[in-house]
Amino acid sequence: HPDWYAVNRKGESSHDKPAYVDYYRFLCPNHSGVAPYLAEDYVKEAHKPYVDGVHLDYVRMPDVVLPVSLWKNYGIEQKEELPEYDYCYCDTCRALFKAKTGQDPLELKYPMENQSWINFRLDAVTHVVEAITKAVKADHKFISAAVFPGPSMARKMVRQDWGNWSLDAYFPMIYNKFYYEGAEWIGRSVQESVQTVNGRAKVYA
């Protein structure tokens, strides 16, 4: 299903022109077939009697902003959101957002500042996660995910609003050297994560 893949602000599909590395081929969370397909796929694994649970990874958009220490690896500077790393602007996303707000996201002068457009994509990823979570929990299995560090950074960098998910556990990737941060940053990030989850799930960091 090539039409299921996320499209950047330049109109390039991650199916044939992925960002950064060849395996960055992300599905668009707003395509109607994506959530049911992934939920069914995960339940097939979760249903096996020797499987206690499932762990999600890369359940997000491609990084609109990479951790600063990785910029040199790709010869880029991301001091602003660049079109080639900003997803998703596929026909489905554009039509759904326009039906909801009357605006075409491709015509937004400052898409990175439009809260409705930001929330639209956060909610789309959350919808997919919740579909998978509901299916896995119906099978009485555990579900967790690797997430970006600190819910506020995750929302900005990869459209991942994991503070509003319903998982059993979260594994924030708190790699301080990726961000040229000291050890004290780890504590702040863990604190934000724990406060956001607020006892609803475990945080392992």
Regions found by a protein language model. Name each.
Residues P49, Y58, R121:
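Aromatic/pi-system hotspot detector in well-structured domains
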Residues H1-P49:
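Active-site-adjacent "subsite" loops/lids of carbohydrate-active enzymes
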Residues L38, E45, V54-D57, V136, ...:
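Conserved, mostly hydrophobic/aromatic
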Residues Y50-V51, L167:
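A structural motif
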Residues L82-A205:
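Glycoside hydrolase catalytic-domain groove-lining segments
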Residues H1-V21, Y58-E107:
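Aromatic- and acidic-residue-enriched segments that line the glycan-binding/catalytic groove
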Residues H1, L56-M61, F148-G150, Y175-K177:
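Active-site beta-loop-alpha junctions enriched in small/polar residues
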